[in-house]
């Protein structure tokens, strides 16, 4: 019973350490003018590659006619593993068909730069084949790897939601400024129109007085 409790305490401690180390990993900030790519090396075939991205800061209004960004993942062999079209943010996950350098590219069809918060993780959990090959690899290490991947999934979701929240705040601020500019412009237009009306009325009265004198 005591040994079981000790194991639980060890796993809890390991979980806290892993969670702290994972939380220290920050998302990449990529500015996409035309096309920008990020490379990540996958050590083992069959590893799970996952991540997310969100367009955080943009200089133009994302209306219904905005095409969004294109996202493409290319394998070391040059094959397209995954692609997303016309999006302002999404999640992705796939099994690596082989080990090697993978390329993650963003394409911006507009000339206006877009800032993207990009997060990627390569997860590896040893399987029975790995245990058979490596006699020093025990089931405890496998459990630790599984725990790490579970925590990584939670942290990735937190980072995705945080990036979306940042984008919403930026959009709200941009909308607020746009409303203020529109309101100020409307007041200026109304003041100018009123001024022109006053001048026009005064001109009519001056013509009427001159006619009566004649």
UniProtKB/Swiss-Prot annotation:
Residues 35-122 form the GOLD domain. This is Transmembrane emp24 domain-containing protein p24beta3. Its main location: Golgi. A motif (COPII vesicle coat-binding) lies at residues 204-205. One of its GO terms (biological process) is protein transport. Pfam families: EMP24_GP25L. Involved in vesicular protein trafficking. Mainly functions in the early secretory pathway but also in post-Golgi membranes. Thought to act as cargo receptor at the lumenal side for incorporation of secretory cargo molecules into transport vesicles and to be involved in vesicle coat formation at the cytoplasmic side. The keyword Chaperone does not apply. It comes from Arabidopsis thaliana (Mouse-ear cress). Glycans are attached at residue 172. The modification Omega-N-methylated arginine is found at residues 164, 169. Disulfide bonds: none annotated.
């Amino acid at each position: 019973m005591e040994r079981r409790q000790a194991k639980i305490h060890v796993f809890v401690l390991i979980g806290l350490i892993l969670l702290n180390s994972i939380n220290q990993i920050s998302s990449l900030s990529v500015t996409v003018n035309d096309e920008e790519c990020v490379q990540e090396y996958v050590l083992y075939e069959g590893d799970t590659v996952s991540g997310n991205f969100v367009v955080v800061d943009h200089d133009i209004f994302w209306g219904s006619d905005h095409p969004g960004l294109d996202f493409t993942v290319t394998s070391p062999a040059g094959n397209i593993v995954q692609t997303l079209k016309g999006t302002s943010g999404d999640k992705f996950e796939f099994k690596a068909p082989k080990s090697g350098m993978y390329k993650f590219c963003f394409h911006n069809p507009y000339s206006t730069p877009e800032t993207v918060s990009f997060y990627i993780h390569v997860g590896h959990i040893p399987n029975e084949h790995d245990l058979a090959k490596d006699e020093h690899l025990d089931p405890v290490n496998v459990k630790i790897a599984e725990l790490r991947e579970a925590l990584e999934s939670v942290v990735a979701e937190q980072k995705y939601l945080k990036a979306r929240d940042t984008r919403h705040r930026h959009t709200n601020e941009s909308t607020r400024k746009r409303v203020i500019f529109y309101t100020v412009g409307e007041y200026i237009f109304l003041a100018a129109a009123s001024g022109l009306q006053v001048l026009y009325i005064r001109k009519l009265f001056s013509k009427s007085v001159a006619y009566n004198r004649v």
